[in-house]
């Protein structure tokens, strides 16, 4: 949380990489960790990637795999975790990727599907649950009439900032554009109490 707080104070966008199926994890713990990521004010990233763990020959994890101390999730388990993650993602967060660019021929164990995101999106659609996550709502190549767009403002609080997510949406809740506004509620101590502003 400290690293996220630091870059937020200086106006940087937060883009978090979250790996599932690491050694010691299971589907339930991965879902719980993702919930913390998207609900704990110490985190609440603007954007994120969900990377399933997979095994390549050069990895030290190979020894654990051969010793039975780690196993890749089944496709059903992996898709279940990622579907739960997508459905829990708030409207100000975008999941940009779900796989890493590793050739299937280099993967000893784990997901080899290059279209994993499409598999997950189909499973999300099958739930009939509303999806708030940005990428799922982007207007993409669909047309939109300016007069049909409405501005919605979502306010939320992080550990160090007041956030405003402004989105221009269609009547179907598709996003035509958005803007992020961030106001620090706490400054680093040396900046707030000890530093003098530079001369202009």
Question: Which residues does each PLM region occupy?
Answer:
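Conserved C-terminal portion of the radical SAM core fold
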Residues: 2-60, 76-102
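Short, flexible, glycine/charge-rich loop motifs used to bind or transfer phosphoryl groups or to couple energy/partner
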Residues: 38, 156, 191
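A short, polar/charged loop-to-alpha-helix boundary motif
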Residues: 187-193
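Short glycine/proline- and charge-enriched loop/turn segments
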Residues: 62-69
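C-terminal accessory regions of radical SAM enzymes
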Residues: 69-182, 186
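Broad gene-expression machinery/nucleic-acid interaction feature
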Residues: 47, 163, 199
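Aromatic/acidic cage segments in peptide-binding pockets
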Residues: 56, 183, 196-197
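Acyl-donor binding region in acyl/amide transferases
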Residues: 1, 194-200
């Amino acid at each position: 949380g400290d690293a996220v707080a630091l870059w937020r104070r200086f106006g940087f966008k937060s883009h978090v990489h979250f790996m599932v199926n690491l050694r010691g994890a299971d589907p339930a713990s991965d879902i719980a960790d993702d919930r913390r990521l998207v609900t704990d004010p110490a985190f609440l990233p603007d954007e994120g990637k969900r990377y399933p763990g997979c095994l390549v020959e050069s990895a030290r994890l190979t020894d654990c795999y051969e010793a039975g101390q780690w196993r890749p999730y089944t496709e059903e388990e992996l898709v279940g975790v990622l579907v739960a993650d997508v459905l829990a993602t708030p409207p100000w967060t975008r999941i940009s990727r779900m796989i890493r660019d590793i050739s299937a021929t280099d993967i000893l164990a784990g997901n080899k599907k290059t279209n994993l995101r499409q598999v997950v999106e189909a499973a999300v659609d099958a739930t009939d649950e509303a999806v708030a996550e940005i990428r799922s709502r982007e207007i993409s190549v669909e047309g939109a009439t300016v007069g049909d767009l409405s501005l919605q403002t979502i306010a939320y609080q992080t550990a160090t900032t007041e956030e405003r997510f402004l989105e221009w949406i269609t009547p179907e809740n598709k996003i035509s554009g958005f803007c992020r506004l961030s106001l620090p509620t706490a400054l680093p101590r040396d900046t707030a109490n000890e530093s003098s502003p530079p001369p202009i």
